[in-house]
Curated annotation (Swiss-Prot):
Reactions performed catalytically: 7-carboxy-7-deazaguanine + NH4(+) + ATP = 7-cyano-7-deazaguanine + ADP + phosphate + H2O + H(+)
Parts forming coiled coils: none
Residues bound to Zn(2+): 193, 203, 206, 209
Class of enzymatic activity (EC top level): ligase
InterPro entries the UniProt entry points to: QueC (IPR018317), Rossmann-like_a/b/a_fold (IPR014729)
Co-factor: note: Binds 1 zinc ion per subunit.
Known role: Catalyzes the ATP-dependent conversion of 7-carboxy-7-deazaguanine (CDG) to 7-cyano-7-deazaguanine (preQ(0)).
Signal peptide residues on this chain, from the entry's feature table: none
Family membership noted in the UniProt record: Belongs to the QueC family.
Gene behind this protein: queC
A GO molecular-function descriptor: zinc ion binding
Protein name: 7-cyano-7-deazaguanine synthase
């Protein structure tokens, strides 16, 4: 009987690379995505096309309201997504695109799903560039959540260890794209943009777009998605 794995899937290059990595193992894959604001609704649409390329046992899209978490450009319509010209302009501190407790919320849902379906492995696509700016992407956070998961669940208390896997945790975006290209990831079906147009074009100037474009450039590969 195959082991089951829950994968947090956003439709971006990082989680898609994780999906590709896990798809080459013997895990039975259960993908979990979230629709939490209009600015991420395009991600959810992209996932529908992306997931057809993989042998995913089940894909769940969970609708949650994070708009009560005001103060983030990704959940508050009154805050503009900051735009930049290059990587030199990117913030070195926690940016306004940080969503309070987002990964804790997402991982908590994943933990609940894992316990229900009998999975002991959860995968998330956080990496080096993420935890430079986002506190809930750091290695120590992942380790702490795993410890909590094993304290707070029936399976954990019964000695069946739950593991939070972050296979990209020590990689930069450049290295992730390189790895994904080697594995055959179709990045044309992914999106990174924090502020896409209504017809699905990426802005090319938000933090996420700038980092993505830089990663493809360093790999001497044209980014296959369309920009404004």
């Amino acid at each position: 009987m195959k082991k089951k794995a829950v994968i947090l899937l956003s439709g971006g290059p990082d989680s898609t690379t994780v999906l590709e990595i896990v798809s080459k193992t013997d895990y039975e894959i259960y993908a979990l995505s979230f629709n939490y604001h209009r600015r991420n609704s395009l991600e959810v649409q992209k996932i529908q096309g992306l997931i057809k390329d993989y042998n995913v046992k089940q894909h769940r899209v969970i609708n949650i309201d994070l708009q009560s978490f005001i103060g983030s450009a990704l959940t508050d319509d009154n805050i503009d997504v900051p735009k930049f010209k290059n990587t030199d302009q990117l913030p070195s501190d926690i940016p306004v695109t940080y969503v309070p407790a987002r990964n804790t919320i997402f991982l908590s849902y994943a933990l609940g799903v894992a316990e229900v379906i009998g999975a002991r492995d959860i995968f998330i696509g956080v990496h080096t560039n993420d935890y430079t700016n986002y506190p809930d992407c750091r290695p120590e956070y992942i380790k702490s959540f795993e410890a909590m998961a094993n304290l707070a669940t029936r399976v954990g208390v019964n000695g069946e260890k739950i593991t939070i896997h972050a296979p990209l945790i020590n990689m930069t975006k450049e290295q992730i794209i390189k790895k994904g290209l080697e594995l055959g990831v179709d990045y044309s079906k992914t999106i990174s943009c924090y502020d896409p147009t209504e017809d699905g074009l990426s802005c090319g100037q938000c933090l996420s777009c700038i980092v993505r474009l830089d990663a493809f450039k360093k790999n001497n590969v044209q980014d296959p998605i369309q920009y404004v």
